[in-house]
Amino acid sequence: MQGRLIGVVFCMTILLGALSGSVAQAQPGPPPPPPGGPLPPPPVPAANPITPQKVILGKILFWDEQLSSDDSVACGTCHLPAFGGSDPRSFTSAHPGPDSTFGNGDDIFGSPGMITLDCGGTPIDDPLFGFERQVTGRKSPTMIMAAYAPTLFWDGRAEGPFVDPENGVILINNGGALEAQSVEPILSSVEMACETRTWNDVRQKLIASPPLALATDLTPDIVAALAVNPDYPALFASAFGTPDITAARIGFALATYQRTLISNQSPFDEFLAIGPAALTPQENQGSQLFAQNCFPCHAGPLQTDHSFRRIGVRPVQDDLGRGAITNFGPDNGDFKTPTLRNVALRAPYFHNGGKETLQEVLQFYNAGGDFPNPGLPPNGTNLNPQERNAVIAFLETMTDPRVAAALPPFDHPTLQTYLRRGDANQDEVFDVSDPILILEHLFGGPVSLPCEDAADTNDDGVIDVADVMRGLDRLFGGGTPLPLPSERSLGPDPTADSLGCN
């Protein structure tokens, strides 16, 4: 009886946490999401109502690598539903951090973006990354449930107003954070753009590019849309009435698509609906420990209060976070509190990708943070191993199986394969085992190569002994870096040949 009472109180607390925030911001919009939890509809700005035509245009844009200058990065490249809307490549993709030196304790694990390019397509020797792909200075946050957030990015720099990027006219006075966020990466020379890219460059490229020409396994809704409107001008005309492609319309469409990405069919949602009977004893224990230690930052069905807090992930001077946006000293080192929905899929964690597992995250909170901070109890949470396991079991109930399996509305096309040149065995490291595997493939019998493009070490379109020699020269002879995407980078193979990659 006592356990049921605690569960009911917990559910009511969660529900009240949501209703005090999100409902107040909601404006007339689409029907509520499918049944699964007490989530209100996401707020929708009146200037950008949801329509099926805008949703499908936004979905196509979100998953089209041609939206980047070099055809290698889509929005979805760094925001994969099966990984909770974030980027698993962060485990092996490092930014050197504020000291600009790789391998020190301040490295950041972000997302590979662009090779530094001029807009004629010529690579530029970047002071941090050379001719390799740049890595973002923060880990990619999730786009799932972003529709509910009043501010976006880790520092909250995408806020309520949405200003037309091409003429400075305010298009949305309040509630346009998703539109504002959606357009920023497209001109970022780290994420998707050559150095001096303009919106006219984007426009002309989309006019000339067959939608999703580089992707495979197009989803049924995309196939149906392209059968009627096979090019971008036609898609924009269907969504907006005229074929004009503008930055504002791109932002409107991307935001509209993301407002359909509502995760509300998890075991956690069943728990909110019927109480402790939905969970195992371990998960129920975890829910009670969670309520005692993780409120109010992670409360309500959204599992975030949208606040900015400094919790001691890194020293303040490493990254001012919110303080760099507000220019208000007390905000220095504060970062946005993320939703915990689908958190079990989203490793690594925190804005710097600094914790690889949920166990490491809970140990961080147990210790009261890694660095001095005002945002956590000074003595930490003091959970024992059994209690930490229970909290993790509860956090895992927040995984929506549709997200994990990339089922509608989280389904998407397959993007180009990212590979590391020379990594023939696909273990994410280029080492002597790779030329050995190529030798076994060539001379040792029926040994398959999981990625022929990666095994093509010299990028001549043929797997032969020259690839073995090129790899050994790079490993032991001081040879030059391998052809792009080199052994130090990740990316699609820029060379058209008959080789493939599973």
Stretch-by-stretch model annotation:
Residues 410-502:
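Cellulosome-associated attachment modules in secreted, modular CAZymes
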Residues 22-418:
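Periplasmic c-type cytochrome electron-transfer domains
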Residues 1-4:
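N-terminal secretory signal peptides that target proteins for export/translocation
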Residues 8-21:
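Bacterial N-terminal signal peptides
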Residues 17, 23-25, 58, 484, ...:
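Residue-level detector of intrinsically disordered, flexible termini
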